């Protein structure tokens, strides 16, 4: 009964005094603190929501939120939970207050409650003061980037040997050496992938391609690119980069994999700390020279030898295929002789095996043996066996034109991915293949040659693109042949990817026939040149190039191909370009050039002119009279627009087969589609700043359309005209549902930006081969494909069954009212990449069932 008396008197006294005398005044300030707390909590929640919005946008790009952001959000979550508890007790505690809030019926409880409110208020204020993060996310740096490795034979034992050596505490640096094409890179890739199993053992595994013409900064950039997600280091000096690398790696247990060393690399100059037993780090490199192993002070060297006869035969058999080997009883014996000529070199076995994979007669196999025996070129070192073997694949090409096309592919840097169409345009203008195009402007002959080169293993087809590239060893062989096996090296100057800062002084201008300066650090070209024999000049993708002097083009009477594309800061073409009377190919796309020199009109032999993605403006007045031989004219995404004057010029270009253009006037668009020859030449079309009730696009007239862009337009209706003139002339009783494909057969890319007047884009169903679609800043669009319209189209055209059946890449940005993509978007069978941003009415998990293991990637099509 007297249990209440157990409360210590001093506690009661302290609480009572706290009601009136405490500096903190927890009881008296309780109500005002509660009001302030509720307001600041609202601010905190708003701040949290804003931050989560920023984080969501960055995570949609594939970035990872910062730990400090996560920590702040976690603290907010805890405070929010505690605040809810306080609110639940608020009515009880405030109800106990008396004497105008200066006292309480239960001073101890009110004092404790008031103290919690006060402290929480301070904590919320502190959180609010820290809510403004400059950065909220960063790129995810994986410890190991797994490599895709082709099928191998005889490599497993070597992988285990190298791995065992690496796991030895006494070995910090491991050298893998062997001749070119023997599989050193594949071995290094296999080691790289084994580190996936030991992610917890090492902090980071870094892959660096060194190559023959390496620069220290190039190696540093690759290392820093793996270590840091920011790009602030890009403009630093070489010594500063070395310091950044050292300070980062010094704290880590790292693995550095260096592929293709041709000479010693000073790791100290790069900034890489030496691997020691104490730090547990490792360096592994591949090289063709044992001397490099010694200079690099490798703790152990492992030779990557050619395959044994049995292993070589197994690889060759797999490459040729059993169908060919069984096509004649004598072929297996002859095939073993051919395989033996490869001396167990995997690259040669693959290349020659691929070349022989379509030879079904013993005569062809016997001829192959004779050619291999007669190719007795002697070269020091690796070239003694590799180049003659590789040259066999070159010699086996059908004719001279295919060989010329192949050799041309060596003018770009190692592993450069080049569009097939670009190669073909080069070859046509160089005169390697027939310049007469088909009526649709295409040249199947060029694609056929590329197919032959790919099947011969001389070119590599790139995944998911229409590009091809050349293996670096094959490229070396091609350059060797191009220089007449090294006898006429002055006739060709290729500095692609060499990071040179100026045009070399040792060029023999009188003799040189081909020059290529690609991806260099050249800023100005000011030399005076006299090049009576120069026919090909490639100066492209030089990001620092700002000027080419007038005198550079003064005397190049035989120049046929001039490619200046992707020099972003090049703003002017020299007037002396008018001296290039033999020029047939001119590409200035992706440059800062805004006007064309008057002298361009003198280039009457020009058949290819590319002005895409430039600031070039005007109507190209007089182009038909001054450049009458043009077959290809491209000004897509430039400031040139087809108007009445240019329309007449284009119609007068009687040889024109390929056109990319921009149109602002709907009547001009109608006139283009009304001209069968002109319309069929359109490959890329940009409709810009067009305001009209209706736009009609004819799938018949625009049958060759590959890219369509619609920018800043107000169009109430986009109608697809899929009927031919013959079909329109039929009576209604004669018209049946379409059984053939009625749509744009070649349209693969559509980009829509700031389109008004459209609630849906159901007309896109007529682009059944669409691979890339980007729609942005078009707030009135509610659906990409409307179900009712879509069903009507599919009923009319029976071959349109699955909407977007070939779509691979999809980007939707800033679409406030977009609620749906299409009624059965989950059947998109080929979607591999999606990017959705600021589409609040679109379900957040819209593609989760489609891409369970893929993160959205940011990409742009143009």
From Swiss-Prot:
Molecular functions per Gene Ontology: ADP binding; ATP binding
Pfam families: LRR_14 (PF23598), NB-ARC (PF00931), WH_DRP (PF23559)
Protein name stated in the entry: Probable disease resistance protein At5g43740
Keywords tagged on the record: ATP-binding, Coiled coil, Leucine-rich repeat, Nucleotide-binding, Plant defense, Repeat
Assigned protein family: Belongs to the disease resistance NB-LRR family.
InterPro entries the record matches: Apaf_helical (IPR042197), LRR_dom_sf (IPR032675), LRR_R13L4/SHOC2-like (IPR055414), NB-ARC (IPR002182), P-loop_NTPase (IPR027417), Plant_NBS-LRR (IPR050905), WH-like_DNA-bd_sf (IPR036388)
Description of its domains: The LRR repeats probably act as specificity determinant of pathogen recognition.
LRR repeats: from-to residues: 511-532, 533-555, 558-580, 582-604
Residue intervals of the NB-ARC domain: 135-438
Gene Ontology biological process terms from the UniProt entry: defense response
